[in-house]
Each structure stands twice: as structure tokens, then as C-alpha cells.
Design a protein with these regions (language model features):
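ATP-binding/phosphotransfer module of carbohydrate and carboxylate kinases, centering on a glycine-rich
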Residues: 1-68, 77-81, 102-107, 125-132, ...
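Conserved NAD(P)H cofactor-binding loop of Rossmann-fold oxidoreductase domains
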Residues: 74
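Glycine-rich phosphate-binding loop of actin/hexokinase-like ATP-binding domains
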Residues: 130-188
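Residue-level detector of high-confidence beta-strand sites
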Residues: 37-39, 85, 157
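General beta-strand structural signal in soluble alpha/beta enzymes
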Residues: 110-114
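A charged helix-plus-loop insertion that forms the helical arch/lid used to bind
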Residues: 82-95
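Active-site glycine-centered loops adjacent to acidic/histidine catalytic or metal-binding residues
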Residues: 18, 115, 141
Length: 312
């Protein structure tokens, strides 16, 4: 991402947008506090044209109330364009020119990043920077995603793809992932992966019921949840040994399910000590993307004041 900023510009008020597959949240973020929060459904029919109209309407509604725009979005933000490892996840929004669409309606600085990267940056604000330089946020939900912070810096990188750790290899003989590769972590650990198995049982159920049965020590449910947790524990071990990760925070509907993180911790503790890593549950809720995007874009803009351009 590249940004330009006037050295005299104030950056107190952010218009933050969080674009998901089913909803778009918007708010003014000032000093880390959410104000004027709104939520609408993500356009599904004639999605691209409807998204242009939705963004125009939101920018009009908040006109005059913000100094910059920060966007957290599902998928990958590549040079301001919305894409994904599995374009089917975006429906009619694949290759949507997100930054240009917003720029048509404001002359304020605009920054964009993946929603899990944004959530990672929000969670990192709660850490002591003297103790934690290398940090990962993992969301285990419908899919598996991540945000990586190394030496205090959030990794987004030129193509916006950094942090897609759900698409690292867990089992070369595992199921085909939505990205087209066989055996990704997401294809084994995610809520979608859990349901792919539990829906085929003689007594089929959804992931919520799987976890209810897991807490009742049901054998099949316990084996399925353990399979998911083992993939996440191995992923964390790889992050620790590969990047000297100091802390991992886990969120998402699966990641925050009762008993899940403690199981991941137990499985991780069975590995040699060099693979151990401090684990915590995510603290931010549904507004992590809004808050994280606002913090990150502001930090990028402040960094730019000396040079006029920053690359995030």
C-alpha cells in the first residue's frame, strides 16, 4: 500500500469500514473509540455496481466528519483491488477496484488491508511492546486466517497476501482446500472443514452442535475437534520455530469456542519446549477490524510525514 499525506494534516478522526462477506460495518474511530457505528448487508445482487453505490452513500453520510479512511476487508487487497485465493468467496466482487471506488468520493488519505491483518493490529495494541516484538493473531472460524507482526511491524507486503497462514500445509494427504491445494490448515481446522465431516455422520450436525457434543465427551466430536486443534497447534509450532514468535492470540467462532484453546495449548505442550509459545484468547470482538484498520492506517500516515510517502 502507498499513501501520501500533507505534513500539516490532522489525523484525529478516521472513517473506518469493515467489509465482510455478509455485512459492512462503518464507524468514526477517534482515540480508539467507536462512534456512529452502522452496519448494513454486503451487496449480493449485481454486487460490483451495488458496492460502488453503497460506498458512495456511506462516504456521503459521514462527509466532513473524518480526516482519513481506513478499510478492513475480507480477501486480499492487492494494489487497492479486492481479490482472494479462492475468488468464489467474493462472488461478484472479485477484482473489485476498492480504493478507486472510495477515492471517487473523497480527497482524504485512504488505506486498505485484509480484515484479519487489521484484527491482528488491534490485538497488538493490547500488548506490551517491550515484551512482545513478534506476534501472531489467528482466527479459526469459517476459514482460518492470520496476521503477522515482526519487530513491531504488521506484514502486508507488496501483494497484500502476508498472513494467509491458513493456507500452509497441514496434511499432504488431507482434503482439497478452497484455494485448490490439498491439505491446507483451513481444510482441516476451520468451521467449514468441521462441518464437512460432521454433516456426513449418521446423526449429522453443525459445528456448534459438534462443540456441544465435544464438551459432553462424545467420541466422534472429540476426535473431530482434536483434529482441528492439532492442526492449529502444529501451525503455532511452525510459527514459533520459523519466526521466533513470542505470543499468539486466537480468535474466531471456533477459536473462541469453550475448551478449544485449552486443547490447542495442551497439544502444543506435548511438543519439545522450543516449539512452545504463549497463547491468549482474542479480546476485541466484532469491531476488531474497524479499530485495527484505523490504528494501522494512522500509524502509516504518521510515518509518512517526514517523507511524504509510506509503504505499509
Amino acid at each position: 500500500m502507498s499513501l501520501t499525506v500533507d505534513s500539516g494534516q490532522t489525523l484525529q478522526r478516521c472513517l473506518a469500514l469493515d467489509i465482510g462477506g455478509t455485512k459492512i460495518a462503518s464507524a468514526i474511530v477517534k482515540n480508539g473509540e467507536i462512534q456512529q457505528r452502522k452496519q448494513i448487508s454486503t451487496p449480493q445482487d449485481d454486487a460490483a455496481q451495488a458496492m460502488h453505490q453503497t460506498l458512495a452513500r456511506l462516504l456521503k453520510e459521514y462527509e466532513g466528519q473524518f480526516d482519513y479512511v481506513a478499510v478492513a476487508s475480507t480477501g486480499i487487497i492487492n494494489q487497492g483491488i479486492l481479490t482472494a485465493l479462492n475468488p468464489k468467496n467474493l462472488g461478484g466482487l472479485a477484482q473489485f477496484p476498492l480504493k478507486d471506488s472510495i477515492a471517487q468520493h473523497t480527497d482524504k488519505p485512504i488505506g486498505l488491508l485484509n480484515d484479519v491483518q487489521a484484527a491482528a493490529y488491534a490485538e497488538y495494541q493490547l500488548q506490551n511492546p517491550n515484551d512482545v516484538q513478534n506476534f501472531t493473531f489467528i482466527t479459526v472460524s469459517t476459514g482460518v486466517g492470520g496476521g503477522l507482526i515482526l519487530n513491531h511491524r504488521l506484514l502486508t507486503e507488496p501483494n497484500g497476501i502476508a498472513g494467509h497462514i491458513g493456507h500452509t500445509l497441514a496434511d499432504p494427504n488431507g482434503p482439497i482446500c478452497g484455494c485448490g491445494r490439498r491439505g491446507c490448515v483451513e481444510a482441516i481446522a476451520s468451521g467449514r472443514a468441521i462441518e464437512a465431516v460432521s454433516s456426513q455422520w449418521d446423526d449429522p450436525c453443525d459445528p456448534k452442535e459438534v462443540f456441544a457434543r465435544f464438551r459432553q465427551n462424545d467420541e466422534k466430536a472429540t476426535a473431530l475437534v482434536t483434529r482441528s486443534a492439532q492442526a492449529i497447534a502444529n501451525l503455532i509450532a511452525d510459527l514459533k520455530i520459523g519466526l521466533d514468535m513470542q505470543k499468539v492470540v486466537v480468535g474466531g467462532s471456533v477459536g473462541l469456542a469453550e475448551g478449544y484453546l485449552s486443547l490447542v495449548q495442551s497439544l502444543l505442550s506435548e511438543l519439545p519446549v522450543v516449539y512452545h509459545c504463549e497463547l491468549e484468547s482474542a479480546q476485541f470482538g466484532q469491531d476488531a477490524g474497524l479499530i485495527g484498520a484505523a490504528y494501522w492506517v494512522k500509524d502509516c500516515l504518521l510515518q509518512a510525514k517526514n517523507t511524504g510517502v509510506v509503504y505499509g
